[in-house]
Amino acid sequence: MGNCVALEISCDQTLNHACGCLFGDRNYILKMEANLEALQNTMQELEERRDDLLRRVVIEEDKGLQRLAQVQGWLSRVKDVCSQVNDLLKAKSIQTERLCLCGYCSKNFISGRNYGINVLKKLKHVEGLLAKGVFEVVAEKIPAPKVEKKHIQTTVGLDAMVGRAWNSLMKDERRTLGLYGMGGVGKTTLLASINNKFLEGMNGFDLVIWVVVSKDLQNEGIQEQILGRLGLHRGWKQVTEKEKASYICNILNVKKFVLLLDDLWSEVDLEKIGVPPLTRENGSKIVFTTRSKDVCRDMEVDGEMKVDCLPPDEAWELFQKKVGPIPLQSHEDIPTLARKVAEKCCGLPLALSVIGKAMASRETVQEWQHVIHVLNSSSHEFPSMEEKILPVLKFSYDDLKDEKVKLCFLYCSLFPEDYEVRKEELIEYWMCEGFIDGNEDEDGANNKGHDIIGSLVRAHLLMDGELTTKVKMHDVIREMALWIASNFGKQKETLCVKPGVQLCHIPKDINWESLRRMSLMCNQIANISSSSNSPNLSTLLLQNNKLVHISCDFFRFMPALVVLDLSRNSSLSSLPEAISKLGSLQYINLSTTGIKWLPVSFKELKKLIHLNLEFTDELESIVGIATSLPNLQVLKLFSSRVCIDGSLMEELLLLEHLKVLTATIKDALILESIQGVDRLVSSIQALCLRNMSAPVIILNTVALGGLQHLEIVGSKISEIKIDWERKGRGELKCTSSPGFKHLSVVEIFNLEGPRDLTWLLFAQNLRRLSVTLSLTIEEIINKEKGMSITNVHPNIVVPFGKLEFLEVRGLDELKRICWNPPALPNLRQFDVRSCLKLPEAATEFPRHANE
């Protein structure tokens, strides 16, 4: 027994010694089971610490913070070691079953030893991770990105605009760029595209800041958006505006930034907000969007860009994308109908998108035809129009400060779609409706009207016409104006606005008693046989119809009517006697009608202040009318059969309030005489010299200081001379500038006698010149005469500097326009025909027009 035991001990020692010599430290096998138990326990502790840490991280991330990189790294390493330990423990049972000699050795010694080494290594690794898994702080504020991407919906035609804006912004000298345009035109989308373009490369900028300003946002609201973008999310309610400005300024002073301000309605004081001055040295820039061009000026931009509606092709492309292919392919007629719907949007992206989406579910021809009918008759009733389009556009209306300016704007909705109305005509309506004080002097009231028009154009509620004398209204803006004028559709009966819709009769469904304004202009109405009781009607527009007859009783019950326009009804030869019942009438326009006489009862219109009888070729006389209208301020007889003669001059002198006179004169002596009567000549704005025969006529630029339009028709005048001096009340009157101050239109037709029109040098503000069928004219400006004028008046050097339209036609002897063809920087149209001796004209002026 003892010998046996002694032998076992001897063998173990021998084996262990051999193993130790051959394979190193036996502890890898001897302590395998203990290390495995320690590894499992430590691993469990590590997983618990990991779970606790993850809970803390989630809480902080929910607050908008970002986990620390070292925390994320630790968690990643824990994840890796968990996987490795799990794989290691899968071999635990196999390796422990191989142990022998009371755990001193393994039946597969090499495998057991290697396993033991891995267990010990993992144990130490896990212990190390456990020791490092103690974090006081697990997350921090997310650093602000240099630029935040903005979501942009499907657009068309944007790339070109972005390119233009980007190129302008990136100019070294550019500091502030204003993007202006009407509501819904895509200004915000353009600004967002500029923002996103910085994602492609910062171009040396440190930060791009986006701020939505909106209409009623105060400075502090702008400041808090900037502070948030700078990563300063602390509460700012207890901090003053000045302190916030200081924080912002201190940070932005050391950065090269781009500040994008969306939807400005008025000037923003950048200094009060804390935006440091933009200089060439710091290179920072500001871009903003606005509906008003005035805001661009108030912000003192050094660059501005108008965002226009889409051209027809691009508008159709956008509309198709919003509608989708299914409706457009559901019937062969729908694409044609869809184009009509798209045309109603007039290129406004907001309308194209909203209406396009609304039409995406309509797949029958009948549905599309119904929509076209709705859009033609009452667009605001179209689904989504009142909810998504009109309210957006209404912000521009709400921003108008003066209630009378708002009334002026709403009045513009009475005209047809795409109709260009003359500014002068619009102002006359407004004055008689009481929107502009008519008691001011003529220049004051007229200037006020032009100021209102300018403000509406700059607010993109009106648009410039093809000619500078006209404006128009975008169709969608017009729908918005009608919607507002009808109290948002609640009082539609107060308006009857159906111009240009091919009516042959006055509609029968009119609520005459509630009616306030009616526009049936540009229709096919020939007869008005009905009578009406319309106690509240103030404006009635019937111009440009086919009127032949108006019922005797039609005007009998319109006591509040102020504005009546019957112009451009060439077959209308008489007015009913009941017109005398229009006791409130202040404005009547009978121009371009066939009126032969004014009814005797016309004298009862005692409140009439504006009478337009221009282009009335059949009107024989107005003797006695003028003296019966004591309040008359505007009398227009330009190109009328009624010419100024001695008796009419005497009658006109009795009009104490006369401010504007347009006249037709046949007699050269009358022309000379009227230029000597201050009260009359000072009011002349347009003058037609018709069938006049005289060797010489003299036009006095002092006397005719208010002349805007001169027409010479069918006359024989050898020479036209200009005088800039005249005697009045015993003293000599002259002007430092010898020319016509306001003369902008000269039209000469069938003039016989003069060889040149050098006197036009005195019309330095001329914008339109038409010379036709005047067979003796050899040149417009004669060299010798021109040089003699410029020698005396050196400030008259370059002729036609403001000319926009030039027409020379049927001038058989015309050899040249001017001896030294001037540059015409503003020329928009040059029309030359049947001037056989003018070979150079066709190439001479278009070149200047395009410069």
Swiss-Prot record:
LRR repeats lie at residues 514-535, 536-557, 560-582, 584-605, 607-629. One of its GO terms (molecular function) is ATP binding. Keywords: ATP-binding, Leucine-rich repeat, Nucleotide-binding, Plant defense, Repeat. InterPro entries: Apaf_helical (IPR042197), Leu-rich_rpt (IPR001611), LRR_dom_sf (IPR032675), NB-ARC (IPR002182), P-loop_NTPase (IPR027417), Plant_NBS-LRR (IPR050905), WH-like_DNA-bd_sf (IPR036388). Pfam families: LRR_8 (PF13855), NB-ARC (PF00931), WH_DRP (PF23559). SUPFAM superfamilies: L domain-like, P-loop containing nucleoside triphosphate hydrolases. The keyword Repeat applies. ATP binds at residues 181-188. GO terms for biological process: defense response. Belongs to the disease resistance NB-LRR family. PANTHER family: NB-ARC DOMAIN-CONTAINING PROTEIN (PTHR33463:SF220), NB-ARC DOMAIN-CONTAINING PROTEIN-RELATED (PTHR33463). The LRR repeats probably act as specificity determinant of pathogen recognition. This is Probable disease resistance protein At1g15890. It comes from Arabidopsis thaliana (Mouse-ear cress).
